[in-house]
């Protein structure tokens, strides 16, 4: 199966990272050490120019969403279409959710400030707002000033930057900003092909991070996770990720142009995936499956019409485009 549905960059981590993890296997009989945790925290802090107290290590960016319910917001506003995990977390905790649905082209500039519960804007009473940048599944990269415009007194803005390191230069990232009311969640899973290990981190004010992690058990991350976080945030690794992001951007441009040449609408974005509309998404997806190609269905995302599909940016994109062409003909 040629998998365009999952946004992990490669089938396995790079050799040097695998070697570092393998070298720690003999230590798995011991609990993770404080020095390993400190080394990982310091690597993240150094990368983003933050104080160590502003870093919380996570078992994947998704754990950050799972912990948000512990902040007990009165009303959580989710900028949609977006990653579905936050809604599931808040719903399970009985926390009211408001979907602030962005109309095409899915830019924050199209989000009006409103108070009505059934309107597309963000109610003033929302004391927690979640926004992706770049957003999954649209791939749209919002200007940082538009994200910061979501701030209000008494409100925490949570920015999902799971795909930020796939954007060349990370120009709109808030990871390096020390703001008391902005919490940034980052993932290392996609770029470093570590979906089976679960690694990420949160960046925010120490008080916010304390509340976020207050109910976690001891040793929430294992030795291999801590090693991976330290390794992936070292200067050489950051440079390698940046080079990979530049290559992905070229592939994305080529892939987008090819899909548009078929007469398809492709959303302008900067993520390592593309969102495009087809006349019949279910028919298209089933045809692609017969060709051994998987893409992501999008009818599960709030605010997104069912005729959209999402496909990861891969070197094999011509195979996908050829298969799509067969259906359109």
Regions found by a protein language model. Give the residues of each.
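N-terminal "arm"/small-domain region of PLP-dependent enzymes with the aminotransferase-like
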Residues: 1-32, 46, 116, 125
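Conserved PLP-binding active-site segment of the aspartate aminotransferase-like
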Residues: 5, 275-280, 291-329
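PLP-dependent aminotransferase class I/II
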Residues: 13-14, 38, 181-259, 264-267
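Conserved N-terminal alpha-helix of the aminotransferase class I/II PLP-enzyme fold
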Residues: 19-60, 251-252
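Conserved beta-loop-alpha segment that forms the PLP phosphate-binding cup at the N-terminus of a helix
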Residues: 37-40, 52-76, 84, 200
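Conserved PLP-anchoring active-site segment centered on the Schiff-base-forming lysine
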Residues: 69-91, 96-103
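Active-site phosphate-binding strand-loop segment of PLP-dependent enzymes
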Residues: 98, 102-168
